[in-house]
Amino acid sequence: MSLLIDFIDETEEVKDEYISLIRGLVEKAAQMENIEEGAELSVTFVDNERIREINRDYRDKDQPTDVISFAMEEMGEGEMEIVGAEMPRMLGDLIISIPRAKEQAEEYGHSFDRELGFLALHGFLHLLGYDHMTEEDEKEMFGRQKEILEAFGLGR
């Protein structure tokens, strides 16, 4: 199984091991979710100020957050479905705040690797259509997160 993942580091703080961790975890999730070969996504690493701007501009929340997902397959109001040639499946974009991930790892008392992996997986599942707006959806999404993290070796 192989996804095409474009990593963009706006912080200049991201080590190769972080990219390897996220690539491996997202590949494992894609395998467990039966995502086809060649599907694409991007992962951008930003600081708290940048994610606050994105959160404000796209979600009307003027505060930093840990991860934001932009699913390409989610149809917005008034958007037309694109039907065309055999193109790779574009899942969407993940934006992860590195400083927020560090803060939360400390706050929750676990490693930065686990927090970064959790955030990447959480965002990835949103790209696949999972959500936690209702209690039932939350139970399904968080249960799936736990299964994948444990299968990858990042369980609690």
From Swiss-Prot:
Protein name: Endoribonuclease YbeY
Chief location: cytoplasm
Family affiliation: Belongs to the endoribonuclease YbeY family.
GO molecular function terms attached to this record: metalloendopeptidase activity; RNA endonuclease activity; zinc ion binding
Family matches, as InterPro entries: MetalPrtase_cat_dom_sf_prd, YbeY, YbeY_CS
Obligatory cofactor(s): Zn(2+)
Residues reported to bind Zn(2+): 122, 126, 132
Coiled coil spans: none
Gene Ontology CC annotations of this record: cytoplasm
Highest taxon above the source species: Bacteria
Keyword Zinc: yes
Cofactor comment: Binds 1 zinc ion.
Organismal lineage: Bacteria, Bacillati, Bacillota, Bacilli, Bacillales
PROSITE patterns noted in UniProt: UPF0054
Function: Single strand-specific metallo-endoribonuclease involved in late-stage 70S ribosome quality control and in maturation of the 3' terminus of the 16S rRNA.
GO BP terms, alphabetized: rRNA processing
E.C. number: 3.1.-.-
Subcellular location: Cytoplasm
